[in-house]
Structures are given as structure tokens and as C-alpha cells.
């Protein structure tokens, strides 16, 4: 039976430096990948020697380490990679994140003392799948980003009945397609970069043109979602029984991870101290926006269950910043920019 405890803050670690930054900034756990067979092949990732140093660093600071093995594998690939997974378990990783059901079954059987997490790449929407996963040896399900708060709460209650924890993405990038089901990347350009093999080309971040009967309706970054932020829903997610809040971003740099972890650590601690209010959420959300956002805002469309037009980032899919005012004058010769701030003051 799962004992109710303080919700876990799970942070990304694309390399050893970022692992240390995440732990020092307040993460309860980190997740990472080795050089092969993780869903973020573009990250630096870890050698076994780096993994050993990272596990030791985390454990001496009471943090856990989860190893992502969350791609689909052929039988031959798994046979070749299995000794590496066994070595990682011997080093002391606390859990394994998997996508492939055959991999899940084998690892749960061979390593019963290691937590097995079902990746969001498994695309577990139906609550009827929880019992099957529990019977195979899973300990936690990472729920799809596309669920509303009501759906998360319902599924969490059902999962707990099968002794399964649930994990929810709290912050970071949102895919335009359901995780684990997107074939868009494999169709793009070279035709070889599969999102289910760790090599997503992110074609949703590119520019497109929309036509109807030969008439161009619009163009731009039409498929690029804004990033996700659950700060205004954090209290509800905790009350629903979710076990872990996950920050996306194994390909983000150390500054991004430091800021995101610090902000969510503040909110989680404030909740348990009875101090999480609208003013604190507003302050922290502003800090998160400065850290990174697409389109000048975050999206909560899936969490709210609404069907508005605030999901996509708009004209620009990269780091957007925050609006501080309107540029009123440029003096190119001496590099002077005059900006009008909302409160009527002037900065030069």
C-alpha cells in the first residue's frame, strides 16, 4: 500500500553538471539517460562512470536517481543493452523509466527492488490499463500531458487502488501530438528521426502554411504549442494524490533547470506550510516566464479542460521573454533605447 507523503519534485538532468545543479536547487529526484536508448538522444547524457558519480552525489544529499530507458527496442538491441542496465542497477539507480512493455516485464522480474516507472511514451490514457501494468510489475505511471485536472484526479484514485503511483508533467515543453503516438518526426526531412527512438526532429516547431481550396489562410509556426506551467493548479494536483511533479527538459541548460527547480521547490514547500497564495504564485510565475516561455505566456489548456485558442505559441517558437513596455525612441548612433513602462516611468 502506498503511504501518503510529500509530493516529489522530479527534475531533468541532461548531464552531470545539471544533475548537481538540480539537486542543489531542491529537487527530490532527478531523471537522466545513458548514451543510448533514452528518449532524449540529443542531450549530453551519461556514461556509466558519470552515472556512478551522479548517483553518489544525489544519494549523499537524500535525492533519488531515475534512469530513462524509454524508447522502443528490438530484441537484439535489448539483449545488447541489458548488461548496461544491470550495471546501472548495480551502481544504485533508484528507478527505471520504460516505454517498451517487454522491457518493463523483464526489468521488473529481474530487479524487483528497483522502482519501474511507465513513461509518458506509453500513452496510458485508459484507467483499465493500470491493473495490467501493476500485474507486470510497474510501480508508477507517468500520465499524459493531455489530461485535465479532473481526469488526473480520477485516474490517480484508480491507480492507487492497484498500488500504482502517478506522475504528472508540471513544467516545460508540450508536444503537439500525444506522446508515444507521434510519427510526424519520422516523416520529416531525412525520414529517419523517430520520436519513439529518442531522435525527435521537432517538426512542430517549424513554419507551415495553411490553405483551404487553394486560398492561403495563414502561415507561421502553426503547430508549436506553448510551454506548460501548473503553478495555479499545483494545490489541486497535490490534493488529488499525485505522487510526483516532473519538470521537462533534459535538453535544457543548467540555468533553466536551476530556476525551474527553485521556483517549484518554493511553491511546494509553501503549500505544505499553508503559505501558497495567489500573490506568491503570481511572483513565481513571472520568474518562470523570464526563465523561458514560448509566445509570451504558458498554456494550461489541457489542465483546465478548456477549448480555447491559447495552446499554440504563435509567430515565434523560441524563447520569448516578457513584455516590459513599448520602445518609444531609438538612437542608433549612441545605442540609446528609450522604453515606456506601464506605470508611466521611463527607463533609458
Regions found by a protein language model. Give the residues of each.
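Basic, amphipathic alpha-helical recognition segments used for DNA target recognition
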Residues: 106
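Conserved SAM-binding loop
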Residues: 11, 96-97
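Alpha-helix capping/helix-boundary segments
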Residues: 102-103
Amino acid at each position: 500500500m502506498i503511504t501518503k507523503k510529500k509530493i516529489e519534485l522530479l527534475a531533468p538532468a541532461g548531464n552531470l553538471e545539471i544533475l548537481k545543479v538540480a539537486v542543489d536547487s531542491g529537487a527530490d529526484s532527478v531523471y537522466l539517460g545513458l548514451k543510448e536508448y533514452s528518449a532524449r538522444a540529443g542531450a549530453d547524457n551519461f556514461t556509466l562512470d558519470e552515472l556512478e558519480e551522479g548517483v553518489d552525489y544525489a544519494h549523499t544529499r537524500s535525492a533519488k536517481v531515475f534512469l530513462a530507458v524509454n524508447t522502443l527496442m528490438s530484441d537484439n538491441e535489448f539483449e545488447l543493452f541489458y548488461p548496461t542496465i544491470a550495471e546501472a542497477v548495480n551502481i544504485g539507480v533508484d528507478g527505471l523509466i520504460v516505454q517498451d512493455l517487454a522491457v518493463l516485464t523483464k526489468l521488473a522480474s529481474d530487479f524487483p527492488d528497483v522502482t519501474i516507472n511507465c513513461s509518458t511514451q506509453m500513452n496510458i490514457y485508459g484507467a483499465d490499463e493500470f491493473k495490467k501494468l501493476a500485474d507486470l510489475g510497474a510501480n508508477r505511471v507517468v500520465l499524459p500531458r493531455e489530461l485535465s485536472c479532473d481526469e488526473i484526479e480520477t485516474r490517480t484514485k484508480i491507480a492507487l487502488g492497484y498500488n500504482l503511483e502517478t506522475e504528472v508533467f508540471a513544467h516545460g515543453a508540450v508536444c503537439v501530438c500525444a506522446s508515444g503516438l507521434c510519427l510526424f518526426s519520422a516523416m520529416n526531412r531525412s525520414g529517419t528521426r523517430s520520436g519513439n527512438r529518442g531522435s525527435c526532429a521537432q517538426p512542430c516547431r517549424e513554419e507551415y502554411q495553411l490553405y483551404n481550396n487553394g486560398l492561403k489562410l495563414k502561415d507561421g509556426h502553426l503547430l508549436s504549442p506553448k510551454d506548460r506551467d501548473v503553478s495555479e493548479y499545483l494545490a489541486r494536483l497535490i490534493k488529488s494524490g499525485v505522487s510526483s511533479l516532473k519538470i521537462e527538459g533534459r535538453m535544457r541548460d543548467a540555468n533553466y533547470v536551476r530556476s525551474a527547480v527553485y521556483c517549484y521547490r518554493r511553491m511546494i514547500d509553501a503549500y505544505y506550510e499553508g503559505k501558497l497564495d495567489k500573490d506568491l504564485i503570481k511572483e513565481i510565475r513571472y520568474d518562470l516566464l523570464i526563465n523561458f516561455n514560448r509566445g509570451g505566456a504558458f498554456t494550461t489548456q489541457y489542465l483546465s479542460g478548456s477549448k480555447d485558442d491559447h495552446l499554440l505559441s504563435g509567430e515565434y517558437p523560441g524563447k520569448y521573454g516578457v513584455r516590459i513596455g513599448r520602445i518609444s525612441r531609438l538612437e542608433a548612433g549612441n545605442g540609446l533605447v528609450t522604453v515606456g513602462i506601464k506605470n508611466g516611468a521611463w527607463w533609458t
